UniProtKB/Swiss-Prot annotation:
PANTHER family according to UniProt: SOLUTE CARRIER FAMILY 35 (PTHR11132)
InterPro entries cross-referenced by the UniProt entry: Sugar_P_trans_dom, TPT_transporter
EamA domain boundaries: 38-156
Stretches the record annotates as Disordered: 321-351
UniProt GO cellular component terms: endosome; Golgi apparatus; Golgi trans cisterna; membrane; trans-Golgi network
Bilayer disposition of the protein: Multi-pass membrane protein
Record's protein name: Probable sugar phosphate/phosphate translocator At5g11230
Family classification: Belongs to the TPT transporter family. TPT (TC 2.A.7.9) subfamily.
Amino acid sequence: MGKGGALSESVIKNIVLSYSYVAIWIFLSFTVIVYNKYILDKKMYNWPFPISLTMIHMSFCSTLAFLIIKVFKFVEPVKMTRETYLRSVVPIGALYALSLWLSNSAYIYLSVSFIQMLKALMPVAVYSIGVLFKKEGFKSDTMMNMLSISFGVAIAAYGEARFDVWGVILQLGAVAFEATRLVLIQILLGDKGIKLNPITSLYYVAPCCLAFLFIPWIYVEFPVLRDTSSFHLDYAIFGANSFCAFALNLAVFLLVGKTSALTMNVAGVVKDWLLIAFSWSVIKDTVTPINLFGYGIAFLGVAYYNHAKLQALKAKEEEKKKIQQADEESGRLLEEREGDVEGKKNDQSGN
C-alpha cells in the first residue's frame, strides 16, 4: 500500500480506538451505577450504608493509586506542596466526600432512571456556581438555556411515579456539591497550573475524602453496623464493586487522554438514555410519558449547551491561530526590514 493507504489505516485505527474507549467508559459507568443501586437498595442486596460503601471505594482506590504512582511508577505524580494540599486539595476532598455520600444515599430512595434525569441539572449548577465565583460571565441566552433544562427536569419530576422528597433533596445536594467541586478545581488548582488526571486525583483526594467520611460514619452508620451482622462484608461483592469504581476512573483517564472531555460529555448522554432504558426494562422501574417528555426537554438543553461550548472552543482556537499568524507575519516583516537596513548600511560603507 502507498502512503495514502497507510494514512487511511492509521485514521481507521484511531477511530476504532476512540470508539472502544467510549464503549468501555459507558460500560463501566453503567456497571458502577447499577451495581451501587443493587447493593444499597432495600429490595435488592439490602445493604443501605452509603457512607460505608463510599469509604470502601475510597480505601480501594487510594491503595491502587498509591501502587500505580509510587510503586510501579506508571503515572508521574504532581508536584504538591503542603500549603497547596491544605488550601486546595482538602476543600475539594470535603466536597467530593459530600457529593459521593449524598449521591449514593439517593439510590436508596429513587429509581436509577429518575436519578439520571435529575443529574441533567449538572450544567445548570456548574454554570450558576461559576457565575457566583466569577469564573463564568453572565449571559442571558445561556441562562435561558439553563432555565429550559431546569424546566424539563421539573416536568420529569412531576411525572415521577416513585417521587420521594428526601431522595430528591439528597440527589440535588449531590449535584450542588459536585458542581462546586468542579468550579473549585478550576479556581484552586487550574489557576495555579496544577493539572490532576483521574489517577493523580485519586492519589491526592481519595485519602482526604476517606478522612472526611470517617466523621459522619462513626455517628451515623458504625453503631448500626456494630449491632447487626451487616458489619461482615461479602468480599466478592464489595471487591468487584470497588474494582469497577477504580476501573471507571482509569477509563476516564484513557478517554479524556485519547479523545476529549467533550467526547465524554456526549458519551454521558448516551449512557443516561441506556440507563433509563435498562431501569425500565430490567429493574422494572416505572418510567412515565411525562418523565420522558420532561427529560427530552432537558436533554435538548444539555445538547445545545455542549454544542455552544464546542463552538466557543473552536472560536478560541481560531483566535489563537490568527494571533499566532499575525505574530509570525510581524516577525517576518521585522526580519525583512532589518535585512533592508543592513543592506543599505553595507552599500553606504562600500561607497
